[in-house]
């Protein structure tokens, strides 16, 4: 379960809203 304010980024659940969060998510995915 994800809240909108949570910056969670994984394959099963994504709670990213806005450019900053999406960039953060992309960085976290690339880092593995």
Swiss-Prot record:
Q: Where in the cell is it found?
A: Secreted
Q: What intrachain disulfides are recorded? A: 2-16, 9-21, 15-25
Read off the SUPFAM superfamilies from this record.
omega toxin-like
Which GO MF term does the entry hold, naming one? ion channel inhibitor activity
Q: Which family does it belong to?
A: Belongs to the neurotoxin 30 (phrixotoxin) family.
Q: In which tissues is it expressed?
A: Expressed by the venom gland.
- Tell me the domain of life: Eukaryota
Which organism is this protein's natural source? Answer: Grammostola rosea
The main location is secreted
Keyword Glycosyltransferase applies = no
Q: Which InterPro entries does this one have?
A: Huwentoxin-1 (IPR011696)
Which Pfam families does this UniProt record tie to the protein? Toxin_12
Question: What is the name listed in the Swiss-Prot or TrEMBL entry for this protein?
Answer: Kappa-theraphotoxin-Gr2b
> What sections of the protein cross the membrane?
none
Give start-end ranges for the coiled-coil region(s): none
Record comment regarding domains: The presence of a 'disulfide through disulfide knot' structurally defines this protein as a knottin.
Q: What does this protein do?
A: Binds the voltage-sensor domain of the potassium channel KvAP (from the archaeon Aeropyrum pernix) and affects channel gating.
One of the record's GO cellular component terms: extracellular region
UniProtKB keywords:
Disulfide bond, Ion channel impairing toxin, Knottin, Neurotoxin, Potassium channel impairing toxin, Secreted, Toxin
